[in-house]
Amino acid sequence: MAEKEKLHTGEIYFPNDPDIMRQQGIWQDMVMEYNNIPHVQPERREQMLRQMFAEVGENCYIETPFYANMGGHHVHLGKNVYANYGLTLVDDTHIYIGDGTMFGPHVTLATAGHPIDPVLRSKGLQYNMPIHIGRNCWLGAGVIVMPGVTIGDNVVIGAGSIVTKDIPSGVVAVGNPCRVLRQVGEHDQKFYYKDRQIDPELFEKY
């Protein structure tokens, strides 16, 4: 099996294989080009995003700069996905992001890992595991999602959290390692930051 065929199998492989590196260089040049498109050219930005990423739903926006190992080629975006500055996609294998999900500044989604054994690691070997993030999630600033993690729908991940295990739907989760803090519920329909009251009209206004 060729090394590039192991990108999506979870097997240990050699990422510096010439075929992989050649394609990766082309894709990373596209990221560099995207990062230099002026904000006053939104149509060009959207067009290039669709060229780079595996899938892009309607009304997606990624602030610049962003970074992607494979240029976003293995990233699947639903509709209305927003990413703030400094998004890092270690997209050596697939990353799936659901409709309406938002990322704060400097979020990292890392699908790649390396063997713990120092001999194997010194050879530059790695493996990749996919990341799945559900619909209507909010990942706060500086969140890191590790290889193989699945995050359910309607989840809030607190800023600075490191997500090493799956997170179920409908919860607030925080910490290092990230753990479920509580359920998202009726209280959140009435109150926001430090129990400030929400105007009920907001649900109909926007």
Language-model region placement:
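Short-chain dehydrogenase/reductase
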Residues: W138, V156, V172-V174
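Terminal amphipathic alpha-helical/low-complexity segments used for targeting or macromolecular assembly
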Residues: M1-N59, C178-Y206
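C-terminal/domain-terminus segments
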Residues: N154-V163
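Flexible, glycine/small-residue-enriched loop-and-beta-strand segment within the central core
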Residues: E43, P65-I151, N176-P177, R182-Y193
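Short arginine-rich
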Residues: E33-N35, D166-G170
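Conserved catalytic segment of ABC-fold P-loop ATPases
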Residues: G152-V155, P168-G170
